[in-house]
């Protein structure tokens, strides 16, 4: 199974779909809009955490900038009646933090406002994901809460570090530590990489 791809984007015209060139081989990868719009156009290589689904007639690759979003995707597709397409729709329509809060608060009514989610599916999500989202309590939810108060440069730097394979909470800690409020995104990334690579 493919779990990670690192390469250069050669096609990114349709939201949620891209082609990643890895050593001369182009991989069709589907992403959530959350991941898609964090990826900047350009020649910089990126890394994506991949979930692979093998079917008789297709090999489907779903890509995520951070492991936590991929883990949330995997938890979603375990719910009865939720397939990869609907899971991607959910992750494209609501942030991981907001989704986790909905499950914690058993807010099925808000979930029904998401595309493709009816009342029964929303209730099933709340019931079946109650236990599985506990793994995210110290990662996704905290990370998104902390990033909410970050500067734009910090958020850009954190996203770039995540794309390079660093964990969101690890990237946030380092960027927050070195930022004095006056540094550009490029400076933050460069200094953060120096610290992270020396560990």
Curated annotation (Swiss-Prot):
CDD domains noted in UniProt: UBA_RuvA_C
Renumbered residue ranges of the record's region Domain I: 1-65
One of the protein's GO biological processes: DNA recombination
Subcellular location, principal: cytoplasm
Example of a GO cellular component annotation carried by this entry: Holliday junction resolvase complex
Annotated segments matching region Domain II: 66-144
GO molecular function: ATP binding; four-way junction DNA binding; four-way junction helicase activity
UniProt region (Flexible linker), positions on chain: 144-148
UniProt-recorded name of the protein: Holliday junction branch migration complex subunit RuvA
Native organism taxonomy: Bacteria, Pseudomonadati, Pseudomonadota, Gammaproteobacteria, Legionellales
